[in-house]
């Protein structure tokens, strides 16, 4: 006799899991010794009606949230409070398989001209997000570093320490020129905490350089809390092939 119980046929639960995992490919003192990950899990319970009872089937889906670029060794030596965004240390670094980690094992020089050197962890034609570091020499003994992540024709940059200094502005200009001329990137994003002590000055400085504030619900933004994103759109000819 068929079961007549009245029950919902679908239950769903979502949660986010963050953590830190040891990367054994690097010594413990390396800035790459650990990577931080963030997974979004969705557990769904479906119930099907059978002649005598309900049958439950559980599905568990895992969604990798957006990566965050690593800091290089000089930047990792800065005090925690001096990092461009404290959430960088809580960054959403997705766990990878051993084979993938070997492919991303070291940054290699991709381009060097004038004061700008560009380092990459992977070929730019790779389908996965790629780490891009931009090192701009200010003096013989100092340089400005912009750490970025290239993903789906979009470049996300973490602002360096003391981003408002003139040297850092020059380094960003050189970075934007390289991105426009040498890559197929359509948009460059910078980000900083919404409660940053220099929030107003940062908004004015980046606006002056052509950046625009991005609304929080923009579909291209990663799910980072308390962060302001600004975007620099690159004008591309419709017939221009990706480089």
From Swiss-Prot:
Gene Ontology process terms (BP): negative regulation of polyamine transmembrane transport; negative regulation of stress fiber assembly; positive regulation of intracellular protein transport; positive regulation of protein catabolic process; viral translational frameshifting
Highest taxon, organism lineage: Eukaryota
Modified residues (Phosphoserine): 6, 9, 12
Pfam families hit by this protein: ODC_AZ
Keywords, in A-Z order: Cell projection, Cilium, Cytoplasm, Flagellum, Nucleus, Phosphoprotein
InterPro entries cross-referenced by the UniProt entry: Acyl_CoA_acyltransferase (IPR016181), ODC_AZ (IPR002993), ODC_AZ_sf (IPR038581)
GO molecular function: ankyrin repeat binding; ornithine decarboxylase inhibitor activity
SUPFAM superfamilies linked to this entry: Acyl-CoA N-acyltransferases (Nat)
Quaternary context: Interacts with ODC1 and thereby sterically blocks ODC homodimerization. Interacts with AZIN2; this interaction disrupts the interaction between the antizyme and ODC1. Interacts with GGN. Isoform 2 interacts with PPP1R16A; Modulates PPP1CB activity.
Family: Belongs to the ODC antizyme family.
Main function: Ornithine decarboxylase (ODC) antizyme protein that negatively regulates ODC activity and intracellular polyamine biosynthesis and uptake in response to increased intracellular polyamine levels. Binds to ODC monomers, inhibiting the assembly of the functional ODC homodimers. Does not target the ODC monomers for degradation, which allows a protein synthesis-independent restoration of ODC activity. Stabilizes AZIN2 by interfering with its ubiquitination. Involved in the translocation of AZNI2 from ER-Golgi intermediate compartment (ERGIC) to the cytosol.
Protein name: Ornithine decarboxylase antizyme 3
């Amino acid at each position: 006799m068929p079961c007549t119980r009245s029950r919902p046929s679908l239950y769903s639960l979502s949660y986010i899991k963050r953590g830190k995992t040891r990367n054994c490919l690097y010594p413990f003192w390396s800035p790459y010794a650990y990577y931080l990950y963030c997974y979004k899990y969705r557990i769904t319970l479906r119930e099907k009606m059978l002649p005598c009872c309900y049958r439950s089937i559980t599905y568990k889906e895992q969604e990798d949230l957006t990566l965050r670029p690593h800091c290089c060794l000089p930047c990792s030596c800065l005090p925690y409070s001096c990092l461009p965004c404290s959430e960088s240390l809580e960054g959403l670094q997705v766990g990878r398989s051993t084979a993938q980690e070997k492919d991303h094992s070291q940054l290699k020089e991709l381009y060097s001209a004038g004061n700008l050197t560009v380092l990459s962890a992977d070929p730019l034609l790779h389908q996965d997000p790629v780490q891009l570091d931009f090192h701009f020499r200010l003096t013989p003994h100092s340089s400005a570093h912009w750490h970025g992540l290239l993903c789906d024709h979009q470049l996300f940059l973490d602002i360096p320490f003391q981003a408002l200094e003139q040297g850092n502005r020059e380094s960003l200009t050189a970075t934007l020129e390289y991105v426009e001329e040498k890559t197929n990137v359509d948009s460059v994003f910078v980000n900083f905490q919404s409660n940053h002590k220099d929030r107003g000055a940062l908004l004015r400085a980046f606006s002056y350089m052509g950046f625009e504030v991005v609304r929080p619900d923009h579909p291209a933004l990663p799910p980072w809390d308390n962060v302001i994103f600004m975007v620099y759109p690159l004008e591309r000819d419709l017939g221009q092939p990706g480089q």
